A protein has these predicted regions:
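Catalytic "initiation/cleavage/transfer" segments centered on a nucleophilic residue
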Residues: 1-33, 111-185
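Surface-exposed beta-strand edges and their flanking turn/coil or helix-capping segments
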Residues: 53-56, 106-108, 120
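Signature for HUH/AEP ssDNA processing cores
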Residues: 26-97
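Short, solvent-exposed polar/charged micro-motifs at secondary-structure junctions
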Residues: 51-52, 103, 162-163
Length: 185
């Protein structure tokens, strides 16, 4: 798990490079994690003051990422203390760089942080926990904001029969993010 304060600079690409950026980020994530999970969702701002000022909007997104890292890190520690494995993860983020009152986003992470086949009856239970952590993180940053339209994607190299189909679904969902696309990890 990365340190809560550790953030790489936000990176944005021009329209012509968005597809390459998305494919590169997805490929790196699937190469890095045999059991990749991704959550696609929409952040809704309560006040449009955040969306009018690009610098303030970026700062708010960075606060959201930091809050999400911290909450997922704490969740991981609790799992380990309970005797359940929780593998380290690097959160990768894709989002619409020019958003208004909403921002479509995707978070990619190691499914092993919230689920282990030998210790958990369902991977979806762990994913639900991560989703609730994201909702809580956004509410901390934007108190009356909402996190909506959550879509779960699981791409597991450990299941080769379904891998190509699931990867294509994830790629298609990521390509739906409006241009220009930005990313962070």
């Amino acid at each position: 798990m990365n340190n809560c304060n550790e953030n790489e600079a936000l990176k944005t690409n021009s329209d012509g490079n968005n597809v390459m950026l998305i494919r590169r980020v997805l490929q790196q994530a699937t190469d890095h994690y045999p059991r990749l999970s991704a959550l696609g969702f929409t952040l809704q701002y309560a006040n449009c003051h955040s969306c009018d000022n690009e610098q303030q909007g970026n700062a708010q997104l960075l606060r959201f990422y930091a809050e999400a890292y911290c909450r997922i890190g704490e969740y991981s520690k609790i799992r380990i203390e309970a005797g359940k494995p929780s593998q380290p993860t690097l959160l990768r983020w894709l989002w619409e760089a020019e958003s208004t009152s909403t921002c479509r986003m995707m978070m990619l992470f190691n499914l092993g942080v919230c689920s282990h086949p030998r210790h958990d009856s369902s991977a979806m239970d762990g994913i639900q926990e991560v989703m609730s952590l994201l909702v809580a993180a956004w509410c901390e940053v934007e108190p009356n904001g909402e996190l909506t339209e959550i879509k779960v994607h699981r791409v597991e190299r450990t299941n080769p029969a379904a891998f190509d189909k699931r990867y294509a679904e994830l790629r298609d969902a990521a390509l739906q993010i409006a241009s220009p696309v930005a990313f962070a990890r």
